[in-house]
Structures are given as structure tokens and as C-alpha cells.
Swiss-Prot record:
Keywords: Cytoplasm, Decarboxylase, Hydrolase, Lyase, Metal-binding, Zinc. Its EC number is 4.1.1.52. The keyword Heme does not apply. Induction: Strongly expressed during patulin production whereas it was very weakly expressed in non-patulin permissive conditions. It is an enzyme of class 4 (lyase). 6-methylsalicylic acid decarboxylase; part of the gene cluster that mediates the biosynthesis of patulin, an acetate-derived tetraketide mycotoxin produced by several fungal species that shows antimicrobial properties against several bacteria. PatG catalyzes the decarboxylation of 6-methylsalicylic acid to yield m-cresol. The pathway begins with the synthesis of 6-methylsalicylic acid by the polyketide synthase (PKS) patK via condensation of acetate and malonate units. GO terms for cellular component: cytosol. InterPro entries: ACMSD, Amidohydro-rel, Metal_Hydrolase. This is 6-methylsalicylic acid decarboxylase. Belongs to the metallo-dependent hydrolases superfamily. ACMSD family. One of its GO terms (molecular function) is metal ion binding.
Length: 325
């Protein structure tokens, strides 16, 4: 089946140059090679028909000057739109935005990206600023309100933790720490009421939701008994967590995939590769495991590989139908 890949990065030249000026990715990850030819080649190998491009962390915020960060987001979005326009059956994109603390600049870029460039959604990172300002932060509510009004698809990608020290020199943060950051921001969104208050957003969590599916029952069972509680039962908290969408990037293994499929709502699990940031051997390994996984129905497989994404990105439905004829 021709897949739709919702977790797939690209490196505009301006982004690569900004990372090099900053001394590299603060997470400790290397900057991988990327070209459109390499991108198309991996899509053929993975049997991907349509890729939704995104700029991975740290994104435009690598520029600490607000004006430069906004300009970098604009350059990334213009380049992504040009790729999509040249190959509309093969590509879409999630728009980049500057730091969420720059509310006016973020709202301006959302307006440009959705109205003028027809972005398929927007990328947000798990936290912003020098502290633990996860995505439920009250200061980010005007942005959530705008995205909910637009019924936007929001792709949440982890970024480095406040503490950038590595476990050891073999373990850059994306390898082990990133899923914790995804779980933390998901719980922040749940406990601060963002999920409840802005239901128009369709939120994709990277890497099978990080630690959320594994730990949600632990937190949801304790929260109702805490002095400061949410006024929600355990069941209501768990059900709120199930409103997220989840991608399979670097996560299709016997333990994680089984747990994710049991936890997520039908149609809320989407294929993702994490190209080019994950090593190619890891990408093909996890994809092969997903393709050979026999503990899911054919209906579920169709949803994961393609059909669930078509519900989120309806513009692809007519195009993909014609392309498959």
C-alpha cells in the first residue's frame, strides 16, 4: 500500500546555515545530509507516495534574535511550498513558526502559511524559551485559539530538554530523551485544559506519543486524589489523552507498537519515518517491522499506512485516488 509519511524532515539551506553558525544542534544530534533526490529515493524504498515535510527541532528558534527567527521561518515555509507546488502528489508540509513567545510573529506566519502557502498544518516543538515552558503555557493560548479556529493539524516534535547534558557521549538526546519531552508536553496540554478549550486542533504526537501511552494510567489514577486536581475522573483523563494522534516514527517494535495500537483510538495512528534524522538502517528496520506486524487487522493497517492521514489531509484524497489509478 502506498503510504503517507507524516514525520519526515527536510533541511532548507537557510536552516542548515543557521545551525552551523550556532555550532550545531543543541541536542547533540548530527546534521544529516538532505537533498530532494535523497528524499525521493527513500520514499521509493519505504513505498511512500506522499510526504508531509517539516523542519525538525530546534527549528527557527536556533536564531535568538526574534527578527531573524521570523525571517528563517518564512524562508523555510517558502521553500517547502515550492517543493509541494513542484510535486503536489508527493509532498505537503507543516509550516514552521518562530518562538511561541513572539506571539505576533507566530500569528503572522500562521496567516501567511495557511492563507497564502496553503500549508497542511503547523509544527510546534515541545517547549520554548530557556525554561520549562511546555505547550500548555498560558502565554501560548492566543496561538492555540488561532489554530483551533483554523481546525489546524498540529505536528508536535520534541526538542532538547532544558538540561542539555547528555547521558553519555554515546547518547545524544533524540535517541532516548526526546520521548520524555513529548510525554511532558502532552501532559501539560491535558492538565492545563488546552485540549479541552481548543478542540479544533488535531494534534499529532511524535514517536508514538513518547512516554504518554505508557504513563498516562499512572498519572490519571493519582490526579483525582491530589489536593489540586482537574475535576476529572481517571477515565476522563485517559479519554482526553486518546484524542491525540500518534505517529510510528522510530517506534514500530514489539512492545511499543502493541501498546500504542491498544491505547490509541482507531484512525489515530499514522505512519512516520523520521527521515533523514534517524539512521537509514533504523528507518528501514522499523518500517519493515510495521509492514510485517501480524497482530493488527488489514483495516488497521490501511488506517496506519494511509487512510487515517487522508482524513487529516483531505486535499490528498482526490489527488491520491487519481495517482493510484
Amino acid at each position: 500500500m502506498a503510504k503517507i509519511d507524516v514525520h519526515h524532515h527536510f533541511y532548507p539551506q537557510a536552516m542548515r546555515e543557521a545551525l552551523e553558525r550556532a555550532g550545531g544542534d543543541p541536542s547533540g544530534w548530527y546534521i544529516p545530509p538532505w537533498t530532494l533526490d535523497l528524499d525521493k529515493e527513500i520514499s521509493r524504498v519505504l513505498k511512500v507516495q506522499t510526504t508531509i515535510l517539516s523542519v525538525t527541532a530546534p527549528g527557527p528558534g536556533i536564531e535568538t534574535d526574534p527578527g531573524k527567527a521570523a525571517a528563517l521561518a518564512r524562508l523555510c515555509n517558502e521553500e517547502a511550498a515550492a517543493i509541494r507546488d513542484a510535486h503536489p502528489l508527493q509532498y505537503g508540509f507543516f509550516a514552521s513558526v518562530p518562538s511561541l513567545f513572539d506571539t505576533a510573529a507566530v500569528l503572522a506566519e500562521i496567516e501567511h502559511a495557511f492563507t497564502n502557502l496553503h500549508a497542511d498544518g503547523v509544527t510546534l516543538y515541545t517547549r520554548y524559551g530557556a525554561g520549562h515552558s511546555y505547550l500548555g503555557d498560558e502565554r501560548f493560548r492566543p496561538i492555540w485559539a488561532e489554530l483551533s479556529k483554523r481546525r489546524a493539524v498540529v505536528f508536535i516534535h520534541p526538542t532538547h530538554a532544558v538540561d542539555t547534558q547528555l547521558i553519555n557521549s554515546w547518547m545524544p538526546q533524540p535517541m532516548f530523551d526526546y520521548p520524555h519531552e513529548t510525554g511532558r508536553t502532552a501532559m501539560d496540554l491535558l492538565t492545563r485544559g488546552v485540549i479541552r478549550d481548543y478542540p479544533g486542533c488535531k494534534i499529532i504526537l511524535s514517536h508514538a506519543g513518547g512516554t504518554l501511552p505508557y504513563l498516562i494510567h499512572r498519572a490519571a489514577t493519582m490526579l483525582p486524589f491530589m489536593p489540586r486536581n482537574l475535576g476529572m475522573s481517571r477515565e476522563e483523563i485517559v479519554e482526553a489523552a486518546r484524542t491525540f494522534y500518534f505517529d510510528t516514527a522510530i517506534s514500530a517494535n514489539p512492545v511499543t507498537l502493541k501498546a500504542l495500537l491498544e491505547f490509541a483510538k482507531p484512525g489515530h495512528v499514522l505512519f512516520g519515518s523520521d527521515f533523514p534524522n534517524a539512521p537509514r538502517g533504523a528507518i528501514t528496520h522499523f518500517t519493515s517491522f510495521l509492514e510485517g506486524y501480524d497482530n493488527m487487522s488489514e483495516e488497521t493497517r490501511r488506517l496506519v499506512e494511509r487512510e487515517a492521514a487522508l482524513e487529516l489531509f483531505p486535499r490528498l484524497r482526490g489527488q491520491s485516488t487519481r495517482a493510484c489509478l
